[in-house]
């Protein structure tokens, strides 16, 4: 498990302009991949690509709720690099916490459109490309601890991550015959753009998550999630598919047991 674990691989990372996606872009290119960063945040995405090096990373602006834009992002990648080996479907949104009695259904629809429909569109078009080229690819989706249990996250976000995990498992069944693996990576609370807006809120999120965590002495960072995604993207996990790899310090297991 040393050396260039993605040497020569072509990777799309959605939500790659910040947080877990940006960490994954840096890590994957360190391991020999060429990465296309897909995001709506154009300035941030371009800056990440430039910081990595434009010989290894490029940016493509895409609204993942628009299937035509998703298809074009995959086409751009294949035209630029000749193939697609890995999709890290990481883009997501999260609404504020609130009572189910006051559920904002417009916000619910937006969350589902990004977190589920957008992921489904990318899985569809990435898999089509892999099948057409005979690539035994890997698809990794950022799910969440909230895909396993209710309670920690907002209602719409929790529902979307449960749905996404179902999609991962269903796609695993449909794509296995082509040699394509599909897995989820499920973090506990991480201080990223979804949860934090400045240094003060980063500390608040990390303090809260550390206080409620099962595993003490470690603060979960975006890099830890990127490490898990690297494992699932690489041939180190060559016979792993349909799994939801928890990066939660045992939170989901212990909470399920205690409940």
From Swiss-Prot:
User: Does the keyword Oxidoreductase feature in the UniProt annotation?
Assistant: yes
List the active site: 157
User: What residues bind NAD(+), as annotated?
Assistant: 12-36
Sorted alphabetically, the keyword list is: Oxidoreductase
Disulphide bond pairs:
none
InterPro entries hit by this protein: NAD(P)-bd_dom_sf (IPR036291), SDR_fam (IPR002347)
Q: Which GO terms describe its molecular function?
A: oxidoreductase activity
E.C. code: 1.1.1.-
Superkingdom of the source species? Eukaryota
Q: Which SUPFAM superfamilies match?
A: NAD(P)-binding Rossmann-fold domains
Listed Pfam families = adh_short_C2 (PF13561)
Which amino acids does the record list as binding substrate? 144
Entry's family note: Belongs to the short-chain dehydrogenases/reductases (SDR) family.
Protein name, please? Short-chain dehydrogenase reductase 5
Q: Which organism is the protein's source? A: Arabidopsis thaliana (Mouse-ear cress)
Which taxonomic lineage does the organism of this UniProt entry have? Eukaryota, Viridiplantae, Streptophyta, Embryophyta, Tracheophyta
The gene from which this protein is expressed is SDR5
């Amino acid at each position: 498990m040393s050396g260039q674990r993605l040497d020569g691989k072509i990777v799309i990372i959605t939500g790659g302009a910040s947080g877990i996606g940006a960490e994954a872009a840096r890590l994957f290119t360190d391991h020999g991949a060429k990465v296309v960063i897909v995001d709506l945040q154009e300035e941030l995405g371009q800056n990440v690509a430039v910081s990595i090096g434009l010989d290894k990373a490029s940016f493509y602006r895409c609204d993942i709720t628009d299937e035509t834009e998703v298809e074009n992002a995959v086409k751009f990648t294949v035209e630029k690099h000749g193939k697609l080996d890995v999709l890290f479907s990481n883009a997501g949104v999260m609404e504020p916490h609130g009572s189910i009695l006051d559920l904002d259904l417009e916000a619910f629809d937006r969350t589902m459109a990004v977190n589920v429909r957008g992921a489904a569109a990318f899985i569809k078009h990435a898999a089509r490309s892999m099948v057409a080229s005979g690539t035994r690819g890997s698809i990794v989706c950022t799910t969440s601890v909230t895909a396993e249990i209710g309670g920690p996250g907002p209602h719409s976000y929790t529902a979307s991550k449960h749905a996404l995990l179902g999609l991962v498992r269903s796609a695993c069944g449909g794509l296995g015959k082509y040699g394509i693996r599909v897995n989820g990576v499920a973090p506990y609370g991480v201080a990223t753009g979804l949860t934090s807006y400045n240094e003060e809120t980063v500390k608040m999120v990390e303090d809260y998550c550390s206080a409620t965590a099962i595993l003490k002495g470690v603060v979960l960072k975006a890099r830890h999630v990127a490490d898990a995604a690297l494992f699932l993207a690489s041939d180190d996990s060559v016979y792993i598919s349909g799994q939801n790899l928890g990066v939660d310090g045992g939170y989901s297991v212990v909470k399920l047991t205690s409940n």
